[in-house]
Amino acid sequence: MLENLSTEHRNEKTMNLDEMNIKEVLQSMNEEDRTVALAVEKEIEHIEKVVRVVIQSFEEEGRLIYIGAGTSGRLGILDAVECPPTFGTDDKMVQGFIAGGLKAFTKAVEGAEDREELAEEDLKSIGLNEKDTVIGIAASGRTPYVIGGLKYANSVGASTASISCNKNAEISKYAKLNVEVETGAEILTGSTRLKAGTAQKLVLNMISTASMIGVGKVYKNLMVDVQSTNEKLVERSKRIIVEATGVSYEVAAEHYEKAERNVKAAIVMVLLQCEYGEALEKLKQAKGFVKKAL
């Protein structure tokens, strides 16, 4: 029942939202947004458990799969598509599915979120297996598409987790791990693209970033697996080598090219004064962790 969900309640502070001037609306939104990070903080221990499971999946060559509808689905896809350029993953390692398919990313597909079987079809299409982790995302915590996906994931032995913005969410019953960030009433009643969406984005940022750190995609606080897909990222790659090694920009650029634009290898080459092949071998032995390779 929607009336029992805190995300559907009316916000007592914004009953006269339509009478506020623009500045008052913005101040109200900002005031409410300040509460989101605090709500996420209360769920850190649960988020940590999810990260550990995701790392285990990655170590076993499994995948992280997000499923959601509407804003929740879009946020999952957004997090997934940022992983290849940021962490050098292939596009299968982290994937996002939205009820109604990719066309639903830009235009609502009526009724798609109400069909459990659509999620099962989506997960079957990628050969979901016991090495994978499926995270169901739903602000309300009751979306049938997400429930169907979690049911199927459990049936094949995959790890499962849920992210919702209501306590005792329905989807929590179908996932082994639960993150329930209680964001409360929105300034615009029921518009969960606001605080609830912000909370989900923060949690997804945490899960993907911490998991990638856990499998060696980061050295110190540098994204050493960044893929140089444009000029900005080429420059960033060279700057990362400078920051990691302390050499001049020119020396960093030289090693970047010698390492065939592999930032990790370039760092190892500089710090260990070795050739590209040796750097690759050391990284392989260290399972991709730069610190261990050194």
Curated annotation (Swiss-Prot):
Reaction equation(s) it catalyzes:
N-acetyl-D-muramate 6-phosphate + H2O = N-acetyl-D-glucosamine 6-phosphate + (R)-lactate
Q: In which pathway does it act?
A: Amino-sugar metabolism; N-acetylmuramate degradation
Q: Show the active-site residues.
A: E82 (proton donor), E113
Q: Which SUPFAM superfamilies does the record match to this protein?
A: SIS domain
Documented EC number(s): 4.2.1.126
- Superkingdom in the source lineage: Bacteria
The answer to keyword Nucleus applying to this record is: no
UniProt function note: Specifically catalyzes the cleavage of the D-lactyl ether substituent of MurNAc 6-phosphate, producing GlcNAc 6-phosphate and D-lactate.
Q: Which family does the record claim for this protein?
A: Belongs to the GCKR-like family. MurNAc-6-P etherase subfamily.
Q: State the oligomer form and interacting partners.
A: Homodimer.
Q: What else is known?
A: A lyase-type mechanism (elimination/hydration) is suggested for the cleavage of the lactyl ether bond of MurNAc 6-phosphate, with the formation of an alpha,beta-unsaturated aldehyde intermediate with (E)-stereochemistry, followed by the syn addition of water to give product.
User: What is the protein name stated in its UniProt record?
Assistant: N-acetylmuramic acid 6-phosphate etherase
